């Protein structure tokens, strides 16, 4: 084998030795490749111990939850003082909660009473309005029934008195006119038909400011009486 053939045969890449030494775990003299240390065998044992379930602590029987909680975190010597302080704190919290709840309930009750009073007042107003509406409906219905009735409405008392006063005034004026024209006529001639007709004409010709239909009825009654 020539020198060239030997060089070609032993022409090894630079990193080949590194790979070989890494596989054989043999460090080089120049210290470029560090030997890996094998993992400790104690770690699996520690992990196994950690995975073991701890022993359950037996709870003392016949004790309140607060006592058990205090004994869990406080030394037995100080447990009585801790229980006393915790009990007082819980009592204060309970009293404060009860006071807040009482104030809240009183505020709610006051609000409910105010709402109830407002509702009662509103109902009374609605009842009043309903009564007024019902009264108006009854009045309208009564007026409609009276207007649709064929019977004539009776005259009002004041209206009747006014008509009588006007009739008396007309009759008085007529009597004065007739008396003025009958001067010089004897009582025997006063009852004659001619005198009666003259009185009727004076009554018909007199001016009357009232109802003509009412005056006509009165005049017809006078004619019937005098004839």
From Swiss-Prot:
Source domain of life: Viruses
Region (Disordered): 24-60
Protein localization: Virion; Host cytoplasm
Keywords of this entry: Chaperone, Host cytoplasm, Phosphoprotein, Viral RNA replication, Virion
Segments passing through the bilayer: none
Pfam annotation, one family: Rhabdo_M1
GO cellular component, one term: virion component
Modification after translation: Phosphorylated by host kinases.
Assembly information from the UniProt record: Homotrimer when phosphorylated. This trimer is stabilized by binding to the L protein. Binds soluble protein N, and ribonucleocapsid.
Function: Non catalytic polymerase cofactor and regulatory protein that plays a role in viral transcription and replication. Stabilizes the RNA polymerase L to the N-RNA template and binds the soluble protein N, preventing it from encapsidating non-genomic RNA.
Recorded family membership: Belongs to the novirhabdovirus protein P family.
Protein name, as recorded: Phosphoprotein
Source organism: Hirame rhabdovirus (strain Korea/CA 9703/1997)
